[in-house]
UniProtKB/Swiss-Prot annotation:
Family (UniProt): Belongs to the eukaryotic ribosomal protein eS25 family.
Subunit structure of this chain's protein: Component of the small ribosomal subunit. Mature ribosomes consist of a small (40S) and a large (60S) subunit. The 40S subunit contains about 32 different proteins and 1 molecule of RNA (18S). The 60S subunit contains 45 different proteins and 3 molecules of RNA (25S, 5.8S and 5S).
Record Pfam families: Ribosomal_S25
Protein name: Small ribosomal subunit protein eS25
GO molecular function, a single term: structural constituent of ribosome
Localization of this protein: Cytoplasm
Length: 105
């Protein structure tokens, strides 16, 4: 077998520009999700909505409040603690990462 001839940098660059191969195949089309525009400061309107709507939910957690009320996660955690102190919701499971509540009986 004959020894392989070394290409110069210029020859390598020209070969790369010439193409020949398709671009790298993507796994999926990649649906882009819009950035959430949730509020981070509680106004009176959202506070009233929390007091009115949350006691009717059968399952209450931080993610439920974030999805339904469009508030930030830290704001949802504070709201859940406040509602628990007021006796509006009762804890089902309190974990370091997740807190699950239900409506008070």
């Amino acid at each position: 077998m004959a020894p392989k001839v070394q290409q110069t940098k210029a020859a390598k660059a020209a070969a790369a520009l010439a193409g020949g191969k398709k671009g790298k195949k993507k796994w999926n089309k990649g649906k882009v999700k819009d950035k959430a525009q949730h509020i981070v400061i509680l106004d009176q309107e959202k506070y009233d909505r929390i007091l009115k709507d949350v006691p009717t939910y059968k399952y209450v957690s931080v993610s439920v409040l974030v999805d339904r009320l469009k508030i930030g996660g830290s704001l949802a955690r504070v709201a859940l603690r406040q509602l628990e102190e007021d006796g509006i919701i009762t804890p089902v499971l309190k974990h370091s990462k997740q807190a699950i509540y239900t409506r008070a009986q």
